[in-house]
Amino acid sequence: MMGLARFGLKKMENLEFWKLFGSGTGEGFTPIPNFSVYGLLCVWESETAARKALLNEELFKKYMSRASHTSAIFMSPVSSRGYWSGAQPFIAKKDTPKDFVAVLTRATVRWSKLKSFWKEAPGISNRIGTDKNVMFKIGLGEVPIRQQLTFSIWKNLSHMEKFAHQTGSHRD
């Protein structure tokens, strides 16, 4: 069903950008697929449009009826770098958050770096998995093995920055 979603998403009113993701086993930070956990990122014209679509669009109704668990997380970007499929979907709109902060990191792993990337993944997964400042985390893939992303929610920005810039192999 996930692969067919692109046809419905292309037709949705007020949907400015979207991406479908698969996940890896465990917390998602492995190259072995988990065919029961998927992700969908949507950038809407407004939060009102997003909430209306979640309630009324047939695609979302089907997902809700078939899934054992779903989560919808509404966010406003505070920072963004680079392009994604030729677009800049996240336009910073808010000041630096005082409390919870969600982070989405995305990378296309070079073929020559795949082995070292996946060799480092278990260590990073273990560290983020035991960090008491992480509220939620999952590894996802836009394209299996190569185009990877992480999505995490932290208690605050300083905890996330400390993890990202001061811990072992994740530093570089």
Where are the predicted features?
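A common structural junction motif
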Residues: E58-S65, R171-D172
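Short S/T/G/P-rich N-terminal loop/turn motif that feeds into the first structured element of a domain
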Residues: M1-Y38, E47-L55, S65-L149, S158-Q166
